[in-house]
Amino acid sequence: MGIKFLEFIKPFCAVLPEIQKPERKIQFREKVLWTAITLFIFLVCCQIPLFGIMSSDSADPFYWMRVILASNRGTLMELGISPIVTSGLIMQLLAGAKIIEVGDTPKDRALFNGAQKLFGMIITIGQAIVYVMTGMYGDPSEMGAGICLLIIIQLFVAGLIVLLLDELLQKGYGLGSGISLFIATNICETIVWKAFSPTTVNTGRGTEFEGAIIALFHLLATRTDKVRALREAFYRQNLPNILNLIATVFVFAVVIYFQGFRVDLPIKSARYRGQYNTYPIKLFYTSNIPIILQSALVSNLYVISQMLSTRFSGNFLVNLLGTWSDATSGGPARAYPVAGLCYYLSPPESFGSVLDDPVHAAIYIVFMLGSCAFFSKTWIEVSGSSAKDVAKQLKEQQMVMRGHRETSMVHELNRYIPTAAAFGGLCIGGLSVMADFLGAIGSGTGILLAVTIIYQYFEIFVKEQSEMGSMGALLF
C-alpha cells in the first residue's frame, strides 16, 4: 500500500521546484558562502512586512511558539518553518504507523522526500488561509477578497522560499539544514535581545529597560536603595530578569555536558586485518528532531484551537480543546490558553506557576517526556538510522563489529540504538521541562534547540577541518 501511495503522488512531485544535487564536491568556503546567503535571505524576509494587512496588533496566539518556529509576526516569515516541520511530522507518523511504507532504495527515499515537500506546500496554503480568515490581519470582510488572496499568495511564496532554502543546504551546497539554521538564528537573536534590549517599558514601578543586563545597571544607577534595585533586577516579573539569564546559561552548560554522553561500539575492517575503529551511539541519537516535531504538533493544535474558539466561542467541545485570554503586560499583545487541552500542554510560566497548579505541571511533564520519546523512537525508522540501516552502512564500508558476524550485527545494534533513541528523547524532553521551570529566556524548547544546533555546526566544522587538513586550509 505504501509503495502505491508514493507512486500515486509521483506525477505531482515531478512538477515541484527542486534544487539539483551538486555535480562536484562543494568546497568549505563555498558552503560557508551559500549558508551566509541563505541566512541573509531569511533575515531579510523576517523584516519585510506583508502588503495589504490592516492590522497585526491583535493578540498573538503563537507568541510562545514563534522563537521555536523561526517566525516573525506580520512579515513574510509569518509561518516560519511550521509548514516544513508539520509535513515532516505527518509523513513520519504515516510511515511509523505503516500506512505508507518507505523502502531502502534511493527511489523510494526520493519519493518520500518529494511527498514531504508536496505536503509542505499544501500545509503552507492551508495555514495561510486560516491565518487570514481568523482575522489575524484584520476583518476579512473589510479587507475584501482581493487583499485576502494577495496576503495568502505572499505567505505561500515565502513558504516556498523557505522550502527551497532548506533543500539548498540539505543537498550539500551549504552547512547543516535550513530548518536548524533558521531556528538557531531566531533563538540566539531572542536571547541577545532579551539581555541587551534598549527598549523602555512603562511598568507600575516606573520606566524600565526590557534588556535584563541594561535594566540591572539602570536600576543600580537610578535607585537609592541598591539592595532593592538588585532584588528588582533579579526577580522582576513580566520582563526578562537576571535569574532568567543565569538559568539560560545554566541550561546551555547542562545540554553541552550531555552532548558528550555516548557508547562507542568497537568495529573492525573485514578486509584489512588490524584496522580498528569505533561506531559512536550518542545519548541524543536523534538530536533535536523529537523536540522540533513536538513543537510542530503543539503549534498546529494551537492553530486549530484558536480558529475554532474565534468562530465557535462558548461551545463545550471547543472549550475542551482550549479557551484563550489576552495579555499585554510587559511586551506585545499575546493570547495564551487558560483552560482546556491547550492549557495543559503549554509550559508553566515559572516555578511559581508550578506550585500554583501542580496538575498542569504534571500533565505537561508527562506529555513532554512521552511525546519526545515516541517521536525519537519512530524517527529512526524513517530517517535511515535504525539498527538495520546502520548494519547495512557498516557492511557497505566492509566493517563489522568485533566479536560478531555480519548476520548478528543487526541484533547487537538493536540492543543499543532503539534504547538510545527513546532514552535520548526522554532526556531531551526532561531538559526542556527543566529549562521551562527555571524560566530560561527563549523557552526550554528554544534553548535546547539552540544548543543542539550550535553543537551540530561545531561538529560539522571539525569534520570539514579534518578533511581539509587544517584551519588555515579552511579559511584561506
UniProtKB/Swiss-Prot annotation:
Location of this chain's protein in the cell: Endoplasmic reticulum membrane
Q: How does it sit in the membrane?
A: Multi-pass membrane protein
**Gene3D superfamilies found in the cross-reference section:** SecY subunit domain (1.10.3370.10)
Q: Name one GO biological process term.
A: protein targeting to ER
Question: What are the entry keywords?
Answer: Developmental protein, Endoplasmic reticulum, Membrane, Protein transport, Translocation, Transmembrane, Transmembrane helix, Transport
Positions in the Cytoplasmic compartment: 2-33, 97-117, 166-172, 262-288, 376-420, 463-476
Chief localisation class: endoplasmic reticulum
Q: Which PROSITE patterns match?
A: SECY_1 (PS00755), SECY_2 (PS00756)
Where are the membrane-spanning stretches? 34-53, 77-96, 118-138, 145-165, 173-193, 241-261, 289-309, 355-375, 421-441, 446-462
One Pfam annotation reads Plug_translocon
Domain of life, per UniProt, equals Eukaryota
GO cellular component labels: endoplasmic reticulum membrane
Q: Which residues lie on this side of the membrane: Lumenal?
A: 54-76, 139-144, 194-240, 310-354, 442-445
Q: Outline the subunit composition.
A: The SEC61 channel-forming translocon complex consists of channel-forming core components SEC61A1, SEC61B and SEC61G and different auxiliary components such as SEC62 and SEC63. The SEC61 channel associates with the multi-pass translocon (MPT) complex.
Q: Which family does it belong to?
A: Belongs to the SecY/SEC61-alpha family.
Q: What does this protein do?
A: Component of SEC61 channel-forming translocon complex that mediates transport of signal peptide-containing precursor polypeptides across the endoplasmic reticulum (ER). Forms a ribosome receptor and a gated pore in the ER membrane, both functions required for cotranslational translocation of nascent polypeptides. May cooperate with auxiliary protein SEC62, SEC63 and HSPA5/BiP to enable post-translational transport of small presecretory proteins.
Protein name, per record: Protein transport protein Sec61 subunit alpha
Lineage summary: Eukaryota, Metazoa, Chordata, Craniata, Vertebrata
